[in-house]
Amino acid sequence: MCRFPTFLLIAIAITMLPTILSITCFVGKNSVVAEEKDFDYCATMKNISTKEITYSGRTGATRVFEKDANDLTINNCYIDFNDQTALTCYCRRSKCNKVVSSLQFDLMTIATK
């Protein structure tokens, strides 16, 4: 009887872990977007004056800002109202990275928090 070595199963599982933990995000502007994968979290930004919505995915640190207490692995979303020019939603899960109209984005960010 042939048994598959346990350490080999563990090694395979560890190499697959980043793929399992990665998420898919929409990337693009307004309604011209594509789904891309292998991100740590998604970001969606709305320019307040032009109402343009930019979708992106990001990798790396799960704290959106340096020395930020909000860790996206603990809290699923973070909404930033930057200098009254842009409203940005950062999410570990794809909660606010959905292709929507400007008004729907506003309503979604209120519901996300």
Curated annotation (Swiss-Prot):
List of glycosylated residues: N47
Secretion signal span: 1-22
Keywords: Glycoprotein, Secreted, Signal
GO CC term, one of those recorded: extracellular region
Cellular localization per UniProt: Secreted
Protein name from the UniProt record: Uncharacterized protein EGAP4.1
